[in-house]
Amino acid sequence: MTNIRKSHPLIKIINSSFIDLPTPSSISSWWNFGSLLGTCLALQILTGLFLAMHYTSDTATAFNSVSHMCREVNYGWVLRYLHANGASMFFICLYMHVGRGIYYGSYMFKETWNTGVILLFTVMATAFMGYVLPWGQMSFWGATVITNLLSAIPYIGTDLVEWIWGGFSVDKATLTRFFAFHFLLPFIISALVMVHLLFLHETGSNNPTGMPSNTDMIPFHPYHTIKDMLGFFVMMLALLCLVLFSPDMLGDPDNYSPANPLSTPPHIKPEWYFLFAYAILRSIPNKLGGVLALVLSILILVIIPLLHTSKQRSMTFRPFSQCLFWLLVADLLTLTWIGGQPVEHPYVIIGQLASILYFLIIIVLMPLTSLMENHLLKW
């Protein structure tokens, strides 16, 4: 008699994806972030569902409903801070996952990579809309500033912004639709994750050497399930420490003041995980130029497979490319720091130089370095 996990129409899909899946034996802990992202998504959907039971998407009551949740709902504060800090963990895992893809050449699986970039955009949109919902000062002004960027689009810009707002400013209609989309998008993300995994399982996983590993495969369960569980416990420990000891560390104090259209906060800034893109936006004095740079700072990931000039897939045996990669990481950390600083000297010039370096590394320096490494190895 055939084992049920290999014969049942539904269970055999799970079996071939998570149990008997042939996996390279050499993949390191950098391959844990996919499962951690799945965990984060499940956590965000669960906590978000319970938060939505107590939230009201009306400008008059939104701020008070969040306050009520934290004060009067049993463990409401845990749910709220798990959701808010869970988003931070989500983005930490996302950026590490993308970084791993760039370092080890996983972008050569073009379909998997492109669905991943679409996922990144969707998660960013979801997080932005979620930040607007508590209807604090930074929620209101963040929504106003970021949506207003669309007015830079020639001819249709102003109409587009007013269409998104549902009026002539960020108001009740905006909050209601943002809540509707914030609730809907995680389920669309879940469907996109399925597509992402479908494409990944067509080719199988990459490995640190970047070479085919068809001759050295092991089953996903129990080896990698145990390894993923370690990552899960480390992440949950970090998240719980954040939630229980310093839940507001990554938030903005301005968001504890109710939204007031008549008083602008001294420094309008998004959540920390968008600061690098915000710094690139601010570093260009022209509005349309800034918006284009903002979009391109993420969209540039799509052309990374086209810029691959090396004969080797992974950076494991390419020391010059490794130096450039870590320079890119340092540059992104610098941009994140600059995004949180006021627009004054010397932060402006540092931001502009870091923005130029960001695009320069990806578009010019990495392909040229790869060609140089090919030449050094007589290829």
Swiss-Prot record:
GO terms for cellular component: mitochondrial inner membrane; respiratory chain complex III. InterPro entries: Cyt_b/b6_C (IPR005798), Cyt_b/b6_C_sf (IPR036150), Cyt_b/b6_N (IPR005797), Cytb/b6-like_sf (IPR027387), Cytochrome_b (IPR030689), Cytochrome_b_C_euk/bac (IPR048260), Cytochrome_b_N_euk/bac (IPR048259), Di-haem_cyt_TM (IPR016174). Keywords: Electron transport, Heme, Iron, Membrane, Metal-binding, Mitochondrion, Mitochondrion inner membrane, Respiratory chain, Transmembrane, Transmembrane helix, Transport, Ubiquinone. Its cofactor is heme b. Heme b b566 binds at H97, H196. Coiled coil: none annotated. This is Cytochrome b. It comes from Chalinolobus tuberculatus. The lineage of its organism: Eukaryota, Metazoa, Chordata, Craniata, Vertebrata.
